Amino acid sequence: MSNSAIFKVRLKRTRKNKNLTQEQLAEAVGLGVRTIGRYEQGSSFPNERVLHELAEVLKVKTDWLSAKN
């Protein structure tokens, strides 16, 4: 499985485990809901800054979320 495929699964699963909606996550990191949706669908991948913010809000390590481990 590619890093982007792992990322989309981990992002969605972690967001749901934290009981956050796409809207809540988007607001917390200053993105649009559509952007979060594209990340979770695997049609887009965040830049390093956004990846770090997502990991911080979700309380996970950036490397784990991005599947760089």
Model-assigned labels for residue ranges:
Residues 1-17:
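A short, Lys/Arg-rich alpha-helix, primarily the initiator
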Residues 1-2, 56, 66-69:
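Short, charged recognition helix plus adjacent turn
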Residues 47-64:
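DNA major-groove recognition helix of helix-turn-helix/homeodomain DNA-binding modules
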Residues 16, 27, 56:
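Alpha-helical residues within the helix-turn-helix
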